Amino acid sequence: DRVELRLTAAGITAIISTISSAPGLQMAWESNINDADQGAGKVWANHATLSSATVLYFDDVEGSGASINAFIDSLDDPSAPTSATIYIQEAGSSPAGVVFQVTGAVTSASTYSKVTVAHIATYGTLTDGDSVGVTIAFSGNNGALVNVVEDTTPQLGLIP
């Protein structure tokens, strides 16, 4: 639960809310699996069985109307084979969620983006209209192995 204290001319008002948000981008889970815009602030998959999903769709704006298009479209920018991990968690006291890794290209449609993913884990059940938070962790670029010299001295017990 969330508690807010507000100072007003009449005194202090306490507001207790049982609605809590999940961390990250505030969106709504959509159960429709079609490759078409489902409306503002929605995130959805291309398969009803999330462990079989290979594409996540993100509307170009999150729940408050802020544009996330450039951010989502950058998920395939790192050069690592798995460029990011996406955590989608339902808001509330007993949340459900799903974890995917970005494994391929991001394609920008006119009002939403398509992200190629591989399923990692699911806990609980996300249902249509659930308020969810979307958290993304980038993996970074692959490092270059240049000027690497193998030194076996410590393993062989030799003293230089």
Model-assigned labels for residue ranges:
Residues 69-90:
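Short coil-to-beta transition motif at edge beta-strands of beta-rich domains
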Residues 92-95:
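Subunit-assembly interface segments of extracellular/virion macromolecular structures
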Residues 106-120:
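Short, solvent-exposed secondary-structure boundary/capping segments
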